[in-house]
Structures are given as C-alpha cells and as structure tokens.
UniProtKB/Swiss-Prot annotation:
Type IV dipeptidyl-peptidase which removes N-terminal dipeptides sequentially from polypeptides having unsubstituted N-termini provided that the penultimate residue is proline. GO terms for biological process: proteolysis. It comes from the Eukaryota. Glycans are attached at N135, N351, N574, N815, N902. This is Probable dipeptidyl-aminopeptidase B. Residues 1-99 are cytoplasmic. The keyword Transmembrane helix applies. It is an enzyme of class 3 (hydrolase). It comes from Ajellomyces capsulatus (strain H143) (Darling's disease fungus). Residues 1-16 have a biased composition (Basic and acidic residues).
Length: 917
C-alpha cells in the first residue's frame, strides 16, 4: 500500500523534479519513500488532497506566467466538449415567444413553490450550509464556495516545479536539467543554477537536445523520458511509453548523440521490441537493459548487444522487480545497480515459479492492446499476476553480479543469511573498491541484517544484525535512503562508512557507521523529533548531512544539518514557525530546492546551503493564483490539537465550516487513512474533498492519527503489530465520543470514511463501534481480510497467518451483527484493482448476504484499478461520496424495519405534479 503511495497518497504517492524522467540513471530510481508508506497506497487520495510527498512528486496548478525555465512533468487534461446543437427552421414570432416564456416562468414558479412546501413539510430537514453572505468576514471578499469540480480539478492545486539536479562531469555542483516543451532555447539543457539566474546570459548552459523529436530510419521518435549520460555526450531516450504497474513501464529506447543531434536504436537488431528498464554506466560507455525479463549490455563503442541472461521469462525476472517487490520494497521499477567504477553490475534474480497467480479481469477494455481470438470477442481479457498473498509462497530473490570485463555472472555466499524462502532483500548500496552493502530481513520483516560483500575476492559476511521485534515489538520498513560516505583522510574520514536510520531512545534517528563492518554507530541526531526518510543530502567536502525532521510537532517538517561527528546541529528552515517544508539537494549539497508546503500558500526557492560560501537565492514559484483565489473564497478553519487516549497523545485536526458558530449543532465526518507509519494530520496547504465537505456542505471534518501512525514515537506505532485495526479503531471511536459530547456537535449525525487502508479502517471502526457512536461509514477499495493482501506488506505488520491465525481472524471484517447496527454504510471498489483485490469486497458481501444484512450500498467500477479512474470513475467516486453523505445527514438512510409505502406522501407529490391517481 504504498503512496493517498496510495491508494495511495501516490497518493494522489514521488520523485524529485524529473527524477525518474531525466536524472542520470545509474541505479534504481531514487524515491523519497517514507517509512510510513504502506503500499495500500495513499496515492489516489493524494491526488485529491494535493499532497506532495517529501521532495518528490508534486502537484501542479494553473500558471501565472509564461516562465518555462523550470521543468514540470507533463499534465494531461480530460476535455469534454459540450454537444453543439445548431438551430434550424423559421424564426419564431415575437408574440409566440412571449407567450411561451410566460408559461415557462409560471410553470417554474409553481414547481418551485411545491418543492419549497415539500421540503418544509418534511421531517427530514438538515443543517443547511452556511450562506456565503454570512461568511464574508471569515473568508474571501466575496465569500465564494468551492465546488466539487474545483477540488477534483487543477483549480486549487499548488504549482510545484521539480528540479532534477545533475552531478557535473568534472565535479561541478549546482547543475540542473531543464526541459523546454516549446523548444525556444533547446528541448533539453544542462545549466548552472547560479549563472542561469541571469536570463540574458548563456554562461554555463549546454543544449543536449534541440527538439523533443528526431528521425531514425524514417521513423519519427517522440521523447517520453530522457536520461543524459554522466559525461553529457549522449542521451538515453524512451519513446512510446506504456505503463505497466504503479512504477513500471515499457517502451522503445534510443541513444541520442549530443554532438550530431542524431539518434539510433539502443538495440539495432531489435529496435521495435519493448524494453522494461535501461540505465547508464557511471563511465557513460555502456547501457544495461532488461527486455522480456532478461538482461543485456550495449557498449557505446559497438552496435552489438551482449546477452547477460537468457532464461528469464514468466517466472524468472532479471534486473527488474516483480509486482510485490515493485510495490512494497523498492517503490520503483529497477533492481539493477552499477558499481561506481562501472566494472560490475549487481542485479536481483527473482524466481516466481512457486508464487500463485491472481486473475485481474477487464470487462470493458483490453489493456494488452491485442485483439481477441476469433469467437472470444465477448469474453473479458484476463491478466494473471504473480501475487503472493499472506502466507503463500514468496518470490525467491538472489543478488547476482555481472563482471563487465570478463562477461560472467557470479554469486557470493554469505554465512548465516536467511533461508531462500524466508529472505527479503530490501536495499543494495555500492561502496568503493568492489564492496557492496546488502540490507536483508526475514520474511516477517522484524530481523535486519546488513551483509558486506567484496566482489573482488568474492567473499561476504554479516556486519550488523538487529532484532527489531525483540527491541520494541516493531518491524523494519524498506527504504532506499542509506548513503555511502567514502573515506577521505584529509577531511577526517580514514575509512569508508554509511549513514543510516536507526532506532534510538524510541525514535527514528540518524547514525553514522564507519568503517563499513562496524556495528556500533555514532548517533547523529537525538531528541523527541523523528527523522523523515533521511538523509536528504550529504556535503562530503564540509562533512555535513542534511535531513528533514518532524519538527516540534509531528505535523511539521523542518530541514536541519549536522556534522558527521554529531556536532553543530543547525536548522536550515525557520523553526520558530509551525510550517511544513520539503527539500531536494544538489549532488554536492551546495544548493537546494526548498519547498514551503504549508500551512500558508506554498512557495519554492532555490537557495545556497548555509555552508556554501557563495550565497544564492532565487524564488521560482509563489503560487500567486492561489493567493488571489483565497481572497475570493471562504474556506474551512483548521484546529490542530492533541487528544489523550489510553496514555497516548494523538494528533487531531478539526476542520470547521466558515463562520463556525459554536451555538449550532453540526454533523461530523471523520476522515482517516491510519496505515502503519503513515500520517494524515499535517500542515500542508491543501484544498481537497475534506475542504469541500467542511466549506461548502457545512459539516465538521475530523482527522485522527491514531496508534500505529508515524512520527509520534515507536511505542505508539509498534503496539498495533499483529492486530491491525484493534487499537486504531478504538482511537477513532474514543475521539468520536469526545466530539459527540461537544455542544456544537450533532451526535446523531456522525460518519467516517477512508480509502484503501482507510477503507479497511472505516469498516473496522463501524464494526467495533456497532452504531453506538458513528451512524454511517463510507469505504473505498477496502481490505476486509489481511489474508487477501500481499505477503510482504501484510506479514510485516501481522506476521504470517500460520504464525498469527488469531490476529488475522480478529482483524478481518466479519462481525455482521455489529455492521447491521449502523444506520447505513457504503462500499465502492474497482474490479481491476491489482493492489487491493475486489475479492476483499466480494467476500464481505457474501458474509452480509449470509447474515441477511442489507443496510449498505455498493458501487462497483468496471476495469478501474486502485485509483478508480477508468471511464470517468474518479469523478463519480467523489460525487457519490458527497451525495451519499448529504443524504445520510439529511436522514434519508434512516433504518425502518418492514418498510411500507408512504401513500399520503405519494399522493401529495402526485397532486403537486398534476397527476390524477
């Protein structure tokens, strides 16, 4: 469940400005994958929530100017043109027009009066949204209200520029890649960040590609993504990109020569075959790539392609992850790593022969693009995915090496490693002189080992081992953020080392291990704040590490630096303000793209880091369009606070309608995600679905980061292990009870909703509550039984079903009697969800049928995946949520045993309609 991931928070989950689309690709794409991300992704919701995770994927919004100097990912818009109906026939006589208009107004008036009488005579009245006139003083000048279309579109998205920092061929710092879609100054350029501030100067600018198209043998190639070689002489080009899963894709690859501005196929003998992955050698003299799950090497000195592996196929993957490793471990599409000297390539060999398949059916579309066989046109297309569910056989992974000079593959045995079927390889990091660090865990992700391998001597040993389960009952989150620190005796570093995140005094902190085989680190950070997916940048010359921390409060983010010896801890951002920052650093950490993400209107600036002797600052985005909109619209107010439940201090965000009146009674909607290590209560600026509910519908929205979530200490996080949903549901219910007791809350109108893991939590909460506090629930793409979810995620937090059968039983949504005690609940799911299979929803429906429970609604979206966006589905999801919620708080879903027709109401409506009955 990766990144609203997921569903993520992905999403709606992210990679620094074009990282993944333009950066020097010499290893796995670097993702700022926080320890919080479950692959029950926060990705879908994040698109609605306008959330930018870490320094990676940001949201884009309307532009204020024509400044195209900073690179943005392409934005696709769905444009639906209204049907144009031409007029025809003779002009209508004026008197006839007048008569018709008079009749129309009289009819409309009568219907309007009847409607008003009907509403006021009905007992099902509800809190009317506060009028815009009453809200002028607390919001914009006009007090306008946002619409659902506003929050689903680009209207309120902060514009976010991505900068793809590039390591200079000669050690230059502060170089960046730029792409200009108009091609006025070249399509792809490398520029010095300092000299580029002077737009009249071309100093430091190198044009790599004049245009985004070129011709090869009469075929026009249109760039989808580009990766310059480290020496800037050749560009690796991807065209005809086709998405596979969340992170993976295929396409045609080309080599574009910068000097001649001409291109050639990466594999001249098979230029029409689609490739899964390609990456540059650090020396710019070769490209390794994977096609049909086999690996190949193309040296630029020749047009010949060398076959590295030949037995890859459906069950055997080389250099690329399978579905579960892509989703839950690497959050990316690469399992290939070049050594710094270019002499060796490390790669994963993934054997899926024992992994069961899950069929994903497509009833409307044919994603394969292939025509069905004759006579099979009316059958759904089925895609079989190797998907290991909890307790099922996992893929067996081995780290192998390719000696580029000798052309041979070899493996290195390490004593006392986990058995093949009980091992997860979660990170690979090259050091120097042929040494490589491999991070592994056991299947349940609670014992960590670090193995150091020497590929020159072909020997290896375990240099560090940690039993996380014994330490605090927790688990190991896979990250790709460990940083190698090379030896530099002149700068006080006699040995190689690495910076890693460790558990120290109940928090995630930074630690420096040196030499590589030293298991005892120097702790770099301490205190109550937790490190966020760090380090973010390393300045080797000045001996500094930069990192992001959840500041004085868990809903904040601030940037700090500290020396390699743990001294001179300094803030980079203004820690006196309660703010949320994100950052990406240049290769040498002399410069940074600083992203202010809230609570006020986001802005971005490129700065020199404090240790840089040459001060520099350039504002590149202020989001003036949002500042202007805020002056016109009335939005919700936000109240951040802590609520103590069972001795744990939980972050809570309350969104109040404009012109909040404490003497009124408001309905309340709880919105949650709640996955292990995740965070939903933060100070990012966002105008999302929750904003619409509070600002326009006039309801209070409450979000609680309960036990199990991130950045409030490992004690509260680890407690949920083995019993997902138990403590988290209790926290939601106990906080809801406190809100129900508030004088401004209508305790008879309380609902809860979530997507993905949040969908699971919605159902678990209303199951545990049994209608005593919440009356309504809305669950989108929910897990209903962790046995149905993928093994790596589920077992990380629940152990295996064989180890913890009782925990799986109690976590499953199964108490149909309790669900029946709620007034009503809604479940929505996509049929082609490859992440949270619709099996979850269908088995729940079967339980409800067997128990004769019918107080629920279901909406199934054909061919939609976990994001639910096929054929207008994304808009329908949120429209359905909003309408269903209004009906609920209107009292339209009141339970009635043995309902009978209301004849008097029917006759009254028929009379108003002019019907004779």
């Amino acid at each position: 469940m990766a990144t609203e991931k997921g569903h993520g928070r992905d999403d709606e989950e992210r990679v620094p400005l074009t990282r993944g689309s333009t950066e020097f690709r010499n290893s796995i794409d670097s993702f700022d994958y926080s320890s919080s991300t479950a692959s029950l992704s926060l990705a879908v919701i994040d698109r609605i929530n306008n959330s930018t995770q870490d320094a990676a994927l940001g949201e884009k919004g309307p532009r204020d100017d024509d400044d195209d100097r900073y690179w943005d990912d392409d934005v696709e818009y769905d444009v639906e043109d209204a049907d144009y109906i031409p007029s025809g026939g003779k002009p209508m006589h004026k008197s006839v027009k007048i008569a018709l208009w008079t009749l129309l107004f009289l009819s409309l008036g009568g219907w309007s009066l009847a409607f008003v009488l009907f509403i006021f005579r009905s007992h099902d009245t509800y809190e009317t949204p506060i009028s815009s006139e009453d809200n002028i003083s607390s919001g914009g000048l006009r007090g306008d209200r946002i619409t659902l279309d506003d929050v689903l579109g680009e209207e309120w998205m902060p514009r976010h520029h991505f900068i793809s920092w590039f390591p200079g061929p000669n050690g230059e710092d502060g170089l960046l890649l730029e792409k200009d879609g108009l091609g006025s100054t070249g399509y792809l350029r490398v520029e010095d960040i300092v000299s580029r501030k002077d737009t009249k100067s071309s100093k430091g600018s190198i044009v790599l590609m004049q245009k985004n198209t070129f011709t090869v043998g009469g075929e026009t190639v249109i760039c989808s993504q580009v990766w310059p070689s480290p020496d800037l002489k050749t560009v690796l080009v991807l065209s005809e990109k086709k998405q596979n899963w969340r992170h993976s894709f295929t396409g045609k690859y080309w080599l574009f020569d910068v000097d001649t501005q001409t291109g050639q196929p990466l594999d001249p003998a098979a230029q029409d075959q689609r490739i899964q992955l390609a990456s540059w050698s650090p020396q710019s003299d070769a490209v390794v790539f994977t096609r049909d799950n086999n690996m190949f090497l193309r040296k630029l000195s020749s047009k010949e392609v060398t076959t590295i592996t030949s037995d890859g196929g459906v069950d055997l993957f080389y250099g690329v992850p399978d579905w579960v490793y892509e989703e839950e471990v690497f959050s990316g599409n690469s399992a290939t790593w070049w050594a710094h000297d270019g002499n060796y390539i490390a790669f994963l060999r993934t054997n899926e022969s024992a992994v069961p398949e899950y069929p994903v059916q497509y009833f409307v579309s044919r994603p394969s693009g292939e025509d069905p066989n004759l006579g099979e046109e009316n059958y759904p297309e089925v895609r079989e995915i190797k998907y290991p569910k909890a307790g099922a056989p996992n893929p067996i992974v081995d780290l192998q090496f390719y000696d580029v000079r000798k052309g041979e593959i070899f493996s290195v045995d390490v004593a006392d490693r986990f058995p093949d079927d009980y091992r997860l390889i979660i990170e690979v990091l090259w050091a120097s002189n042929g040494k490589i660090l491999v991070r592994e865990t056991n299947r349940e992700s609670d014992i960590l080992i670090i193995a150091a391998i020497d590929v020159l001597s072909r020997t290896g040993k375990i240099v560090r081992k940690e039993d996380i389960n014994a330490l605090d009952g927790g688990w190991v989150e896979p990250t790709q953020s460990t940083r190698f620190i090379p030896a530099d005796p002149s700068n006080g570093r006699p040995e190689d080392g690495y910076i890693d995140t460790v558990i120290h005094e109940g928090r995630d902190q930074l630690a420096y291990f040196t030499p590589l085989d030293n298991p005892k680190p120097l702790i770099l950070t301490k205190g109550p704040s937790e490190i966020v997916n760090s380090p973010s940048g390393v300045d080797l010359k000045r001996g500094l590490v930069y990192f992001v921390v959840a500041g004085n409060e868990p809903w904040e983010r601030h940037v700090y630096s500290v020396k390699f010896d743990g001294t001179a801890l300094q803030p980079v951002t203004n820690v006196s303000e309660s703010s949320y920052y994100d950052v990406s650093f240049s290769d040498g950490a002399g410069y940074a793209l600083l992203n202010f993400q809230g609570p006020k209107v986001p802005w971005q600036k490129v700065i020199s880091t404090p240790a840089n002797e040459n001060p520099f600052e350039e504002i590149i985005e202020q989001n003036n369009h949002l500042s202007r909109k805020l002056r016109l619209f009335s939005l919700e107010s936000k109240v951040f606070q802590y609520i103590n439940i069972d001795g744990f201090s939980l972050p809570v965000l309350e969104r109040r309608p404009p012109n909040f009146d404490p003497t009124k009674k408001y309905p309340v909607l709880f919105y949650l995600y709640g996955g292990p290590g995740s965070q939903t209560v933060d100070k990012k600026f966002r105008v999302d679905f929750q904003s619409y509910v509070a600002s326009t519908l006039g309801y209070i929205v409450v979000t609680v980061d309960g036990r199990g979530t991130g950045y409030i200490g490992r004690k509260s996080r680890s407690i949920v292990r083995g019993k997902l949903g138990h403590y988290e549901a209790r926290d939601q219910i106990e906080v809801a009870k406190k809100w129900a007791a508030k004088p401004y809350v209508d305790e008879s109108r309380m609902a809860i909703w979530g997507w993905s893991y949040g969908g699971f939590m919605t159902l678990k909460t209303i199951e545990e509550d049994g209608g005593r506090t919440f009356q309504y629930g809305m669950a989108v793409a929910p897990v209903t039984d962790w046995r149905y979810y993928d093994s790596i995620y589920a077992e990380r937090y629940m152990h295996t079903p064989q180890h913890n059968p009782q925990g799986y039983d109690s976590s499953a949504i199964s108490n149909t009697t309790a669900l029946a005690n709620n007034v009503r609940f809604l479940v929505m799911h996509g049929t082609a969800d490859d992440n949270v299979h619709i099996q979850n929803t269908l088995t729940l429906l079967d339980k409800l049928d067997l128990a004769n429970v019918d107080n629920y609604d279901v909406h199934v979206f054909p061919d939609s995946n976990h994001n639910i966006n096929f054929h207008n589905a994304h808009k329908i999801v949120y429209t359905r949520l909003a309408d269903w919620l209004v009906n609920a708080f209107n009292g339209q879903w009141l339970k009635t045993n043995n309902p009978t027709p209301n004849d008097s109401l029917f006759r009254r409506a028929a009379t108003w309609a002019g019907l004779s009955i």
